[in-house]
Regions:
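Bacterial Sec-dependent N-terminal signal peptides
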Residues: 1-24
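A sequence-level/structural motif corresponding to short, flexible coil/turn segments enriched
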Residues: 19-316
Length: 316
């Protein structure tokens, strides 16, 4: 029987050989069963190990339990690359984890989405809810919370804040219950950002976007204690969509970049200079995109702290 598994690859890149040879493969490890296991996020942990999150649909092999559909799948590795725990969480429908961070009070915070309203899932407001769960250091569930409305909602990225809270970003079609400021029509998605306290209680939740579809992929904290979110906006075509908010969720600025085809931002970071680097994929050959060598290229843009474009490069 074919096994579809998480696969872990670790590379060593000696600085003095950076341009001389391919990275050296140190080790690989796979975990899974006879169905599908997929990883979406990996974080380093304070003990020198790391944690991965994704989903599992297996009931055999390395997977001890499946509640139904796909379950959240969380694996903790030690500093010596040994599995410390492997856990699945969910109900009778689909549950998926997409992002994780170490908790302030020990253990781990994991965000994702769920279409389940039974098992360990505390009800479901609509078609899918944004989900955050907290485990202890051994992977035992401490609490799980759902957020959203009566339509489709989910979390894509979650981080820690400066005031021992957590901030998540994701996508929503809802305009009720926790989400009451939907911007576009019901069939269009907004970016959402929510703040929760140490116990998962919702502090605030805001929507950002346009009359089209808006999606987020990553959120980061900036040196001035604000937050940057990257993703894409789809009106006629997808464009990079970058926005900056303050600690209360107020919009500081928002920018779009791209051309007349699909351009989607997946990663964002703030440099020591205060400039902002964004990367993703571009299929455009016009507008802000100077050159594409193939059907799709890795498109990197550099912005100043106010979101103005400084330069762009395509690689591929």
């Amino acid at each position: 029987m074919k096994i579809k598994s998480f696969i872990y690859l670790i590379f060593a890149i000696p600085a003095f050989n950076l341009f001389c040879q391919a990275p050296e493969l140190l080790w690989t490890k796979s975990l899974g069963g006879s169905e599908s296991e997929v990883g979406f996020d990996v974080i380093g942990t304070a003990d020198g190990g790391f944690l991965t999150v994704g989903y599992s649909s297996s009931t055999d092999g390395d997977i001890e339990f499946n509640a139904g559909g796909i379950d959240m799948f969380i694996v903790k590795f030690s500093s010596s690359n040994e599995v410390m725990f492997s856990k699945t969480f969910g109900g009778s429908d689909d549950d998926q984890s997409l992002s994780a961070v170490e908790a302030y009070n020990g253990g781990f915070i994991v965000g994702g989405w769920s279409t389940t309203s039974d098992g360990i899932i505390p009800g479901n407001y609509g078609l899918s809810d944004a989900i955050v769960l907290k485990t202890d250091v051994f992977g035992n569930l401490e609490w799980i919370k759902n957020y959203g409305g009566s339509n489709i909602d989910g979390i894509r990225s979650i981080i820690r804040t400066d005031d021992t809270s957590y901030l998540f970003t994701g996508t929503s079609h809802s305009n009720d219950i926790d989400i009451t400021d939907h911007i576009g029509p019901e069939d269009k998605s907004d970016i959402i950002v929510g703040k929760i306290d140490l116990s998962g209680n919702l502090v605030w939740l805001n929507s950002y976007g346009s009359v089209g579809d808006d999606y987020s992929n990553q959120i980061i904290k900036t040196k001035d204690s604000c937050y940057l979110i990257c993703g894409y906006r789809k009106l006629d075509f997808e464009d990079y969509y970058i926005l900056k908010i303050n600690g209360d969720g107020d919009l500081i600025w928002e920018k779009t970049f791209g051309g007349s085809a699909e351009d989607v931002a997946y990663g964002i970071d703030e440099l020591s200079s205060g400039n902002i680097i964004v990367c993703g994929v571009s299929l455009s050959e016009d507008g802000d995109v100077g050159y594409v060598s193939g059907i799709a290229d890795n498109w990197v843009i550099l912005l100043d702290s106010a979101g103005n474009l400084l330069w762009e490069r395509s690689y591929g």
